[in-house]
Amino acid sequence: MMYLTYYFIEITIFLAILCTIFIISAKNPMVSILYMIALFVIAAMYLYLIGLGIFSLLYIMIYIGAIAVLFLFIITLLDINSTELSVKSNIRDLPLVLISLIVLTISGLMIYSNDSILINKLLEAFGNDYNTIITQDWFNIENTTLLTTIGNVLLTNNAFILLVLAIVLLLGIIGPISITMKHKE
């Protein structure tokens, strides 16, 4: 059963990369938005498969429910016939996307490797708070509320994923603003 989960994780990673390429190479902005929604669903499936069910639900609610609807609203305001983009202009950005993907992959591997010098230096600089995690009374259920439990899980075990989601949300906010800005020519 465990191998089947790893197999599905590999499939979701491959589908996410494929959807990203389709987003970049789509000629019509509406088709690009549909691929982006598919990418959000695939990312939510990936988060569920690695054991982060609450993050997958939050990802679907925030990104598909809010950001994608906002993008669809902005794109419906644009004149689709005049905004048809050539595939060459989108493919031109592919090296930048690949470089960004490589940098994010290397940084993720550095963070999750046990013998990373960078992470050890950061822990020394900001203080090693593993003692507070270990000394926390995790089995005292009577005094723990749901908000406290979610806060402990978000800010201790999954802080990196929370930061990545915040950066993606920031990019999702900046995107519609840059689309609707009128450039002086």
From Swiss-Prot:
It is found in: Mitochondrion membrane. Keywords: Electron transport, Membrane, Mitochondrion, NAD, Respiratory chain, Translocase, Transmembrane, Transmembrane helix, Transport, Ubiquinone. GO terms for molecular function: NADH dehydrogenase (ubiquinone) activity. The keyword Transmembrane applies. Belongs to the complex I subunit 6 family. It comes from Yarrowia lipolytica (strain CLIB 122 / E 150) (Yeast). This is NADH-ubiquinone oxidoreductase chain 6. Pfam families: Oxidored_q3 (PF00499).
